Amino acid sequence: HALGVSGIELHNLHDPVFARTGSPRDPYAAGQIKHDLFCKGLEIPCIDSITELLDDTSAEEKCEEISVCLRTAADLSVPYVRVRAYDHPGAPQAQDDTVLYLLQRLLPVAQAANCELLLETAGPYADTARLRRLLDRLACDGIGVLWDLYAPCMEKAEPPQQTVTNLGAFVRHVHIRDFAPESGTFCLMGEGAVPTQTLIGALESINYAGHICFEWDPTWLPEAADMHLVFAHFRSYMSRYEKKAVQEIYYNKLHTGRRIWPKEVLIRETFPQVLDRVAEEFPDQIAFKYTT
């Protein structure tokens, strides 16, 4: 939270770390976890299931793993659970039928959990026209889309505005990461070829107001072992795309002058922050004048 993030996403609830008492999977700890997150100004917008909808695992195993995520989402009041299908051999129609069958089996569990299943734009569904056709076959309010900004744009060379045209009404949550084609590796945000500004513009065109979740695997850049620095870099990079809120300006009693902060109130800002704000509000005036 000190880094300025507003949410955290849970991935792989079957990791041993989640088997402990007091972990997010512990239903008896849910109330305390929600209280602690609220006090820190954080929320959990999404839980990521790890099941591959198109692999050779049985339908029962797939549904059980995702159902665990849905039950945990219900306990923690999480609105979304991500499901994914990566590339596997098979005819497209047969693959779509398999995914459709699994989602239809899971829908009653999701509805009971008051949670929405989000199919990620990854694997065969990085082709968002294909994903849209699948969603049209489902014709259900309980299924939305997790837009992985990287996959359609970089893997399928699909313009972001085309993704919006295909899926705009279904987008509930967003993942982002950057990629360096020269080295063929993922990299820190802003150091690769992902057109972040264009993607953010596409999100703004559909009035997206949800979270943008940064994906990072420490093995992608072993020399950047300090995750605090990685996330701080992401937060700093993304701050340029934030819309600054309109901030109140205070007038003096005669309305002959204006001040940025209320009179005789201690402000929690550093000197550089004060200087930046004064320069922003009064760009044509001297912010600080030193005399000798």
What are the language-model segments listed below?
Residues 31-32, 36-46, 52-145, 154:
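Active-site acidic/histidine proton-transfer and metal-coordination neighborhood
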